[in-house]
Amino acid sequence: MKVAIIGAGNMGGAIARGLAQGTIIPASDVTVADPFSGSLETLQADYPEINVTTENPKAIKDADIVILAVKPWLIDQVLSVVHLTPRQVLVSIAGGVTFEQLVKSVGPEQTIFRLIPNTAISQLESMTLISSRNASKEQEQLMLDIFNELGLAVLIPESQMAATTALTSCGIAYVLKYIQAAMQAGIELGIYPKDAQKMVAQSVKGAASLILNNDTHPAIEIDKVTTPGGITIKGLNELDHAGFTSAIIKA
């Protein structure tokens, strides 16, 4: 199974590195194309087994899976010079580019996947959304298997892609904003910035682990640490008075 990745930017490079660390696609079966040789040199310095090229058509020549890791406005331009064969699977990670738009470039018979990872993919901790068109159950499972090695992947209908992107791709920024705000509070209380960052980040990581590992509702875990008359309930009430929940929902 050979994979070509068009684009060696943040996402393309992270996917290539993740595949190289995984067990499904050998690094030697991954080819990355990018017009900027600097990005390719950095990638190959980390993973010498990965193949690199500045020519997109050369990258996809023998590929079974072609991953487009370019900005949405470059999709049509890239697809106009790379001509896919019917056996090749096209994977687009360009946000907002629909199957309808992709079909205009590659035709209605092509097997297509839309993927929305988030930036935690660089840490193999992405929440990746996957939708498919003209894909078999085996192809869908393969895509899930590949991206579950880069975090957690779920298969959803394209109609849910916009809403779920707000939870995952945008959501990671909202969590980081909370971390930043909590750090500022810690600094105001006299805690050194690096210490505050470590404390808050680990608390967020621990909270996520409670939900994922125990499969419980957040309200249950909140109740465990909310003592009547304690500081936690006072803080939670202050967040509610300030419109915290409403702001997250509206965002």
Predicted regions and their residues:
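Short acidic-hydrophobic, aromatic-tinged amphipathic segments that line or gate anion-handling sites
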Residues: N51-N56, V154-I156
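Small-residue helix-packing motif on alpha-helices
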Residues: V30, A59, Y192-M199, E221, ...
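NAD(P)+-binding Rossmann beta1-loop-alpha1 motif at the extreme N-terminus of oxidoreductases
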Residues: M1-T54, E125-S126, I187-L189
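Rossmann-like NAD(P)(H) cofactor-binding subdomain of soluble oxidoreductases
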Residues: S37, Y47, E55-K61, I65-I130
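Hydrophobic packing residues within well-ordered alpha-helices of enzyme cores
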Residues: I15, L19, L40-L43, V78-V82, ...
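NAD(P)-dependent Rossmann-like dehydrogenase/reductase catalytic/cofactor-binding core
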Residues: A201-A251
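Internal alpha-helical scaffold of NAD(P)-dependent oxidoreductase catalytic cores
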Residues: Q101-T111, M127-T164, V175-D215
